[in-house]
């Protein structure tokens, strides 16, 4: 049987699910950019790309050389194709305007160019997260600058989302709203090849991912839930759990997508005015879309993440996602107060 490449899969989606050709072309361009980022990441010290730039992004985080390089790769790959009305990146203060010399399209691309970049120098898996939205009609102009408001759509409006993970293999996980597919980069062929069909997150789990060093800062519902997990068979859940924490959202969520579990990044007492650490637009929404399409669930503790109306490009949010039964349990604990 011939192997199904990403290009072939997208063409088949156009035929069977009426996926617009412009969206197909956009996904292929993003995938090519991810291949280029993968190549740069794999070179590491040999390519002179490790270490920091000595600058900070809008989040106040120190930018790694590969953060900046990955951001530029995605911008340059996607700005000229005519598929996009604009882009927004975690590494940039404001929306990226498509240069006037290029035609504009009907979509918006939102991305975290290199998630988990604090792990780059120690050779731990990192990745690229992206989300595709339709640009509202009132913002579809060829000449005017794109207003940030065009991007502020709830996650339910995403038409596609995915992530590339750069590990022992480079993989692209993708949803177009009809399930989740996984593609592995065949470096000899130079293409992403379908290797994981209709991924499904198990409803129950025996694994959880959370940064335990922050335990003293958690809110009571999170402390209660994690205490029950740690109690194992002797506790109310009557089951032993294992903890896994990589400190790279892409890597942690990838494990949960492929074998189950719950990922937690709660708000805490250190910054009580902030509703969480992770970015709604660049991380939480695309990952929640993927997890839900695989049969899992994702909330901020009290509300489905995909239902949250964004108020700003860099809005933060608490995240609980993964196996449905566990996400529902900790959400219930939050709602009980």
From Swiss-Prot:
<dbReference type="GO" id="GO:0005986">
    <property type="term" value="P:sucrose biosynthetic process"/>
</dbReference>
<comment type="subunit">
    <text>Homotetramer.</text>
</comment>
<dbReference type="GO" id="GO:0005829">
    <property type="term" value="C:cytosol"/>
</dbReference>
<comment type="similarity">
    <text>Belongs to the FBPase class 1 family.</text>
</comment>
<dbReference type="GO" id="GO:0006002">
    <property type="term" value="P:fructose 6-phosphate metabolic process"/>
</dbReference>
<keyword id="KW-0378">Hydrolase</keyword>
<feature type="binding site">
    <location>
        <position position="115"/>
    </location>
    <ligand>
        <name>Mg(2+) 2</name>
    </ligand>
</feature>
<dbReference type="Pfam" id="PF18913">
    <property type="entry name" value="FBPase_C"/>
</dbReference>
<dbReference type="GO" id="GO:0042132">
    <property type="term" value="F:fructose 1,6-bisphosphate 1-phosphatase activity"/>
</dbReference>
<dbReference type="GO" id="GO:0006094">
    <property type="term" value="P:gluconeogenesis"/>
</dbReference>
<dbReference type="InterPro" id="IPR044015">
    <property type="entry name" value="FBPase_C_dom"/>
</dbReference>
<dbReference type="GO" id="GO:0030388">
    <property type="term" value="P:fructose 1,6-bisphosphate metabolic process"/>
</dbReference>
<dbReference type="InterPro" id="IPR033391">
    <property type="entry name" value="FBPase_N"/>
</dbReference>
<feature type="binding site">
    <location>
        <begin position="115"/>
        <end position="118"/>
    </location>
    <ligand>
        <name>substrate</name>
    </ligand>
</feature>
<feature type="binding site">
    <location>
        <position position="211"/>
    </location>
    <ligand>
        <name>substrate</name>
    </ligand>
</feature>
<feature type="binding site">
    <location>
        <position position="114"/>
    </location>
    <ligand>
        <name>Mg(2+) 1</name>
    </ligand>
</feature>
<dbReference type="GO" id="GO:0006000">
    <property type="term" value="P:fructose metabolic process"/>
</dbReference>
<protein>
    <recommendedName>
        <fullName>Fructose-1,6-bisphosphatase class 1</fullName>
        <ecNumber>3.1.3.11</ecNumber>
    </recommendedName>
</protein>
<dbReference type="Pfam" id="PF00316">
    <property type="entry name" value="FBPase"/>
</dbReference>
<feature type="binding site">
    <location>
        <position position="277"/>
    </location>
    <ligand>
        <name>substrate</name>
    </ligand>
</feature>
<feature type="binding site">
    <location>
        <position position="112"/>
    </location>
    <ligand>
        <name>Mg(2+) 2</name>
    </ligand>
</feature>
<feature type="binding site">
    <location>
        <position position="283"/>
    </location>
    <ligand>
        <name>Mg(2+) 2</name>
    </ligand>
</feature>
<dbReference type="InterPro" id="IPR000146">
    <property type="entry name" value="FBPase_class-1"/>
</dbReference>
<feature type="binding site">
    <location>
        <position position="90"/>
    </location>
    <ligand>
        <name>Mg(2+) 1</name>
    </ligand>
</feature>
<keyword id="KW-0479">Metal-binding</keyword>
<dbReference type="GO" id="GO:0000287">
    <property type="term" value="F:magnesium ion binding"/>
</dbReference>
<comment type="pathway">
    <text>Carbohydrate biosynthesis; gluconeogenesis.</text>
</comment>
<keyword id="KW-0963">Cytoplasm</keyword>
<keyword id="KW-0119">Carbohydrate metabolism</keyword>
<keyword id="KW-0460">Magnesium</keyword>
<feature type="binding site">
    <location>
        <position position="112"/>
    </location>
    <ligand>
        <name>Mg(2+) 1</name>
    </ligand>
</feature>
<dbReference type="InterPro" id="IPR028343">
    <property type="entry name" value="FBPtase"/>
</dbReference>
């Amino acid at each position: 049987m011939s192997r199904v490449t990403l290009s072939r899969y997208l063409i088949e989606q156009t035929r069977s699910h009426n996926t617009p050709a412009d969206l197909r072309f956009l996904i292929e361009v993003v995938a090519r950019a991810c291949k280029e980022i993968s190549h740069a990441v794999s070179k590491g010290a040999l390519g002179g790309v490790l270490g920091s730039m000595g600058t900070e992004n809008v989040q106040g985080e120190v930018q790694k050389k590969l953060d900046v390089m990955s951001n530029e790769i995605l911008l340059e790959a996607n700005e000229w194709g005519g598929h996009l009305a604009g882009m927004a990146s975690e590494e940039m203060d404001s929306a990226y305007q498509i240069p006037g010399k290029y035609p504009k399209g009907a979509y918006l691309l939102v991305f975290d160019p290199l998630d988990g970049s604090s792990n780059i120098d120690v050779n731990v898996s990192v990745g690229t997260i992206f989300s595709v939205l339709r640009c509202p009609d009132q913002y579809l102009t060829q000449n005017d600058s794109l207003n940030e408001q065009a991007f502020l759509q709830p996650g339910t409006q995403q038409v596609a989302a995915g992530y590339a993970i750069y590990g022992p293999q480079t993989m692209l996980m993708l949803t177009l709203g009809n399930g989740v597919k996984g593609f592995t980069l065949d470096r000899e062929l130079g293409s992403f090849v379908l290797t994981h069909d209709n991924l499904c997150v198990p409803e129950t789990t025996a694994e959880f991912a959370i940064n335990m060093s922050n335990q003293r800062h958690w809110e009571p519902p999170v402390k209660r839930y994690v205490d029950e997990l740690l109690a194992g068979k002797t506790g109310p859940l009557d089951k032993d759990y294992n903890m896994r924490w990589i400190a790279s959202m892409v890597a942690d969520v990838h494990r949960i997508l492929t074998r189950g579990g719950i990922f937690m990044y709660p708000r805490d007492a250190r910054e009580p005015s902030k509703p969480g650490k992770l970015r709604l637009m660049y991380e939480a929404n695309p990952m929640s879309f993927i997890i839900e399409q695989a049969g899992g669930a994702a909330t901020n503790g009290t509300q489905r993440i995909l239902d949250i109306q964004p108020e700003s490009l860099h809005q933060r949010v608490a995240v609980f996602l993964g196996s449905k039964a566990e996400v529902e349990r900790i959400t219930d604990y939050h709602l009980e107060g």
